[in-house]
């Protein structure tokens, strides 16, 4: 007897998941979970899609990762996504890497309906000392 993996729904009804896109300047993660965030459906990184280390964070690698993730979502039965974009944050950079926008566009182009888009980068309220020393990073 075959069992259905996804949720029981009527046709045409949107089933939401959450896409956690972590875009640093070294890699891009596309991690899709259920609405609670506890159950991982698929996690793909830019590094899994390209051979060279320097291309892990590229928009192309992020696009390939997002396409893979969207295909797996459709298999499971998820048709729509809320998106949480995150940069490294903390004492490091607070701007998302180059793969964030490409991953978001690829999810939309793959036929996933987009719900809410939210920036969840951790921002320090009063943090530890930032790296670089007293006189800062000298170029």
Swiss-Prot record:
Subcellular location(s) per record: Cytoplasm; Nucleus; Nucleus, Nucleolus
Sorted UniProt keywords: Cytoplasm, Nucleus, Ribonucleoprotein, Ribosomal protein
InterPro entries recorded: Ribosomal_uS11 (IPR001971), Ribosomal_uS11_CS (IPR018102), Ribosomal_uS11_sf (IPR036967)
Annotated spans, Disordered: 119-139
Coiled coil: none
One term under GO cellular component: cytoplasmic stress granule
Entry GO MF terms: structural constituent of ribosome
Any Gene Ontology biological process: translation
Basic residues bias (residue ranges): 130-139
Complex and partners: Component of the small ribosomal subunit (SSU). Mature yeast ribosomes consist of a small (40S) and a large (60S) subunit. The 40S small subunit contains 1 molecule of ribosomal RNA (18S rRNA) and at least 33 different proteins. The large 60S subunit contains 3 rRNA molecules (25S, 5.8S and 5S rRNA) and at least 46 different proteins. uS11 interacts with eS1 forming part of the mRNA exit tunnel. uS11 interacts with snoRNA U3. uS11 interacts with MPP10. Component of the ribosomal small subunit (SSU) processome composed of at least 40 protein subunits and snoRNA U3.
Family, similarity comment: Belongs to the universal ribosomal protein uS11 family.
Function: Component of the ribosome, a large ribonucleoprotein complex responsible for the synthesis of proteins in the cell. The small ribosomal subunit (SSU) binds messenger RNAs (mRNAs) and translates the encoded message by selecting cognate aminoacyl-transfer RNA (tRNA) molecules. The large subunit (LSU) contains the ribosomal catalytic site termed the peptidyl transferase center (PTC), which catalyzes the formation of peptide bonds, thereby polymerizing the amino acids delivered by tRNAs into a polypeptide chain.
Additional comment: There are 2 genes for uS11 in S.pombe.
Protein name in UniProt: Small ribosomal subunit protein uS11B
Native source organism of the sequence: Schizosaccharomyces pombe (strain 972 / ATCC 24843)
Upper classification of the organism: Eukaryota, Fungi, Dikarya, Ascomycota, Taphrinomycotina
Gene: rps1402
